[in-house]
Amino acid sequence: MPGRGAVLLAATLAVAGLQAPAAAEGPMAVTRSVLERSNTIVRGSGDRKQKLAALNDLLNGFLDTEALAKLAAGSHLEGRSQAETEEFYRLFHDFFVRTYVQRLLLFDAPDFAYGTETITGDTAKVGTTVITPGDRFAVDYTLRRAGDSWRATDILVEGVSLARNFRAQFDAAVAKDSFQGLLDRLRAKVGAGDGS
């Protein structure tokens, strides 16, 4: 059984390959089409910088990093000023996107299998499997309708929520230092281009 870090890394292609759908497409159709597009980018002839930019655009178009940030922060945003909250959202977005888009290119484009789609009102769950030469990883998306599009509000890798995984890290950072200390760490990582 691979370690959680390896599982999260291997799943990043599925994370990075999503974008805002056309109005007529459901969550599963969107997921399938954009995963294929992400593989095209990774397997394409562009250089690393061009691929990073293209994958970053896909993430910006689909991933609801503010919703992910709220889940990851938990109660730590309570009582914070608007400026602090907005900075946290911005830093989280930049850190999350940079981390997963950069790590994406560590892997050859994998194959995907598609499971079930469940739509309840304005939310949906889409099940997929990331298939690499040596492993298979279940990656389930939680999506929310936003106007005519669908955006991912959480991603579960082998049943582990990425947002809750970040929350555990942030809880530890705040307990050790403070919320301002957490912001300082995020500023440093984003400023240094650190995707680790």
What positions do the PLM features span?
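Bacterial N-terminal signal peptides that target proteins for export
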Residues: 1-9
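Bacterial N-terminal signal peptides
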Residues: 8-17
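Sec/Tat signal peptide C-region and signal peptidase I cleavage site
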Residues: 18-24
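Early exported N-terminus immediately downstream of N-terminal targeting peptides
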Residues: 26-100
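Surface-exposed, polar/charged faces of alpha-helical domains
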Residues: 40, 47-50, 79-83, 109, ...
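Surface-exposed, charged secondary-structure patches
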Residues: 97-137, 189-196
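Short beta-strand edge/turn micro-motifs at domain boundaries
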Residues: 136-165
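Low-complexity, intrinsically disordered terminal/linker segments enriched in charged
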Residues: 154-196
